[in-house]
Amino acid sequence: MYAIIETGGKQYMVREGDVLKVEKLNYPEGEVIALDKVLAVSFEDGNVEFGKPYLENVKVTAKVLEHGKGPKIRVFKYKPKKNYRRRQGHRQPYTKIQIEKIEK
C-alpha cells in the first residue's frame, strides 16, 4: 500500500515505514502528525483512488524524527573588470519524518 502526499509544495510517494526529508515543519521532534493532503492511494488488491485534488477519507500519520539543514550552496556573482564580487551561502532547513500509518 502506498500513498502520494503533498507537503511543503512538493509531492512524495510514501509507504508505511519510509523515512524522508521534507521542507521544514513547525512541530517538535517526537510528535506524531497527520498529513491530510493525500492526492492518491493504492491498496493491496491493486485498486487506486485519486482525489480531486485531495482524498477526504484517507489520512497518513507520521512521526517527526529530527530537524536539520541541508548541504551548503554557495552563490557567487561578479562583474568583470569592476572589482565587484559577492559570495553568499545558503543551507535549506528540512524535517526528517517517518511514515507510521496509512489509513482509510
UniProtKB/Swiss-Prot annotation:
GO terms for molecular function: rRNA binding; structural constituent of ribosome. GO terms for biological process: translation. The keyword Membrane does not apply. GO terms for cellular component: cytoplasm; ribonucleoprotein complex; ribosome. This protein binds to 23S rRNA in the presence of protein L20. Belongs to the bacterial ribosomal protein bL21 family. This is Large ribosomal subunit protein bL21. It comes from Caldanaerobacter subterraneus subsp. tengcongensis (strain DSM 15242 / JCM 11007 / NBRC 100824 / MB4) (Thermoanaerobacter tengcongensis).
